[in-house]
Amino acid sequence: MTATAPITQDVMTLPRKLPEGGPLNIVGLTREELMAALVAAGTPERQARMRMGQVWQWVYHWGVRDFAQMTNLAKDYRALLAEHFAIVLPEVVTRQISADGTRKYLIRIAGGHEVETVYIPEEGRGTLCVSSQVGCTLTCSFCHTGTQKLVRNLTAGEIVGQVMLVRDDLGEWPERGAPKDETRLVSNLVLMGMGEPLYNFENVRNAMKVVMDGEGLSLSRRRITLSTSGVVPEIARTAEEIGCQLAISFHATTDEVRDILVPINKRWNIRTLLDSLRDYPRLSNSERITFEYVMLDGINDSDADARRLVKLISGIPSKINLIPFNEWPGAPYRRSTPERIAAFADIIYKAGYASPIRTPRGEDIMAACGQLKSATERARKSRAQIAAETGL
């Protein structure tokens, strides 16, 4: 019997309204929500769909933040919009740029809370890693975010806002009247920042509806990857309601080790998780599932682990991303040696699976995989203390 996923309803997202009595922030509203809001503000129902489409394109295609600039709308209608609505994004507190070009943004959201967003430029593409929660409930022992307690879920607007802020910083909004440029600086999006996306399903789903909309931010679902530690009851919903690529934060080949590295395994173990994945490619029209596997020296990197991994995922269209562990202050683990990682990858490759080794990016600014944590929450524990807590 499958358990219901705990969607942390005890940690409610803040409403999209500005201070009491203020206008409604439309960033993150779905098309249906925006149209209903326009009607409630006095837009005639027969015009609502057209007006919604016009506002949508101004906000998400052109990046406009001022209703007065929406020049294909009548002046009195622009005034009505300004009276009832606002276009408000989170605030960039700091921006750090790594020696390799990676950018890390510390972003302040409603309530003064902070999350981190990372932009990774690569040859021919640019990947944006966004956060879905302030902190995390999962306490994965190798992950820096897991040492920060969950504060709250992000709203759909706060998730979409991360994309818009980075496009601001990169100057990626099109210029009206200029020739069309198909180059995309933000071409890929990964939900791999702070938090477990499937513990904030509704807001993540609604945010992705905005991000994937062809008349706005227009990122293809094939270029969006959601990474989950294994919230089994929400995996089928992800396929049906979002349909993006799926990555599994796997990291171990036995329940004994995964219970420690990824404690959610105690609720949904390896077999239960893998059984839930077999239909995902068909339901979502995805080619394959990505298994993420962090390489920890002496913990999960043996030849036996590699052979078990291949056996476990047999029958699931997949690839395995091997991630050299990115250390953070107080981390209880060390990165596997390059030779050990290469030997592990070779076993997987010879079994017929792609096994790329991820090149760490942004390590010098603590922006690499597993290193994100709100700057105001960087409480440092000693390596011995965390090792004692995890039992390794």
Curated annotation (Swiss-Prot):
PROSITE patterns recorded: RADICAL_SAM
Major subcellular location class: cytoplasm
Superkingdom, natural source: Bacteria
One Pfam family per UniProt: RlmN_N
EC number: 2.1.1.192
One GO MF term attached to the UniProt entry: tRNA (adenine(37)-C2)-methyltransferase activity
Cofactor note: Binds 1 [4Fe-4S] cluster. The cluster is coordinated with 3 cysteines and an exchangeable S-adenosyl-L-methionine.
Classification via Gene3D superfamilies: 1.10.150.530, Aldolase class I
Residues forming the catalytic site: 116, 369
Sorted UniProt keywords: 4Fe-4S, Cytoplasm, Disulfide bond, Iron, Iron-sulfur, Metal-binding, Methyltransferase, rRNA processing, S-adenosyl-L-methionine, Transferase, tRNA processing
Cross-referenced HAMAP family: RNA_methyltr_RlmN
Protein name: Dual-specificity RNA methyltransferase RlmN
Source organism: Cereibacter sphaeroides (strain ATCC 17025 / ATH 2.4.3) (Rhodobacter sphaeroides)
